Amino acid sequence: MQTSAIPNLSNSTLPKLPSGVKIPNYNRSNLTAGIVHIGLGNFHRAHQSWYLHRLMQQGKAHDWAIIGAGVKEFDKAQRLKLLAQDFLTTLVELSPVGRTVEVVGSMIDYVPIEANNGPLIAQMAKPEIKIVTLTVTEGGYYIDPVSKSFDSSHPDIVYDATHPEAPKTAFGAMVAALRLRRDSGVGP
């Protein structure tokens, strides 16, 4: 028995997916950004991204699309993978009665990753961005393991404090974006 190959995921291949796969019922080209999300791991894609997708399926929240972002070198590979599939992701839900497969279309872009986080700062400073969210691993919070408090002496945090125009961390990039928003008269 020969099975047909499933095409690579992209806007143009959505109609070619197997009939049991749920696909966006909205025109993704009409979506506009409202959220920048830093840290596009599985948790984000199966929760926040899916939640917005479900609203978009109902004809709502089309001005709340997500622009993905990262601040680490390894985020570059993820950006390229998502770019190749038009920022579409797939959510597979398993239950005792079976599984569902749904293509999630709420992400429309992914900020290029640069050492100084300039593109991320510029994107977060845009007036149409209403929310910046993030999901990071435990190490990304810069908590001192002994004191359980924020580690202001961590080298990345010290760097951000002394180089506010070119921060290394997500937190430093958010501070820089807030400064840009303030200086240009855009609300926080």
Question: Which role fits each region the language model picked out?
Answer:
Residues 1-188:
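Non-transmembrane, aqueous-exposed alpha-helical and coiled segments at domain scale
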